[in-house]
Amino acid sequence: SYPINLKNFPRGEESLKATIDKCHAAGLKVGMHMLTSFVGKNDPLVRPKPDPRLLKDAEAVLAADIDAQTQEIPSATPLDQFPLSPAFYGDDRQGLDILIDEEIIHYRQIDHQGRKFLRCVRGFAGTKAAPHKAGAKIHHLVERYGCYLVDLRTSLKDELAERIAGVFNRCGFDMIYFDG
């Protein structure tokens, strides 16, 4: 949702606009740089309840009931489509975060049989650790540069575009660079 950094701009858009106005008064142009369709793990779209319109790719099925403390998550289906490395850059599936119901879980590895997520951190990214029933869907959250991505087939892309355009226009930016 691209919230304004209140550490740097304590009054939100008002502070941001004041900074841009000072730059303009000094004869400078001001640009906005962003990673397009990326959502930070500390964003309100992630915590405390993940927005269902975050991009997911691999899917599995929970093999057994688990409680909120379980650190080995069993799958009834093979996990060969789930990544084994953290997210950086590239076209391959990356990132080690899964979504079950409304809980994000970070896994550190997959067992040799490819049927369990191991060394899991429950209630990851500000979500709440919770019990889950066998048969629940396990979704892999697509990640790049430590951020989740927006599913561009959903209305979330339009909401974020409106948010970004609104801040751009209200604060008086001169240009925007869409990265990523």
Where are these regions (language model features)?
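Glycine/proline-rich, flexible active-site/cofactor-binding loop segments
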Residues: 39, 122, 132-134
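Autoprocessing Asn-cyclization modules and mimics
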Residues: 44-122, 126-129
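Compositionally biased, intrinsically disordered low-complexity regions
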Residues: 14, 33, 97, 116, ...
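Surface-exposed interaction regions enriched in Ser/Thr/Asp/Glu
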Residues: 103, 129-142
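Weak global preference for isoleucine
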Residues: 4, 20, 39, 66, ...
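Aromatic-lined carbohydrate-binding/catalytic grooves of carbohydrate-active enzymes
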Residues: 1-59, 142-180
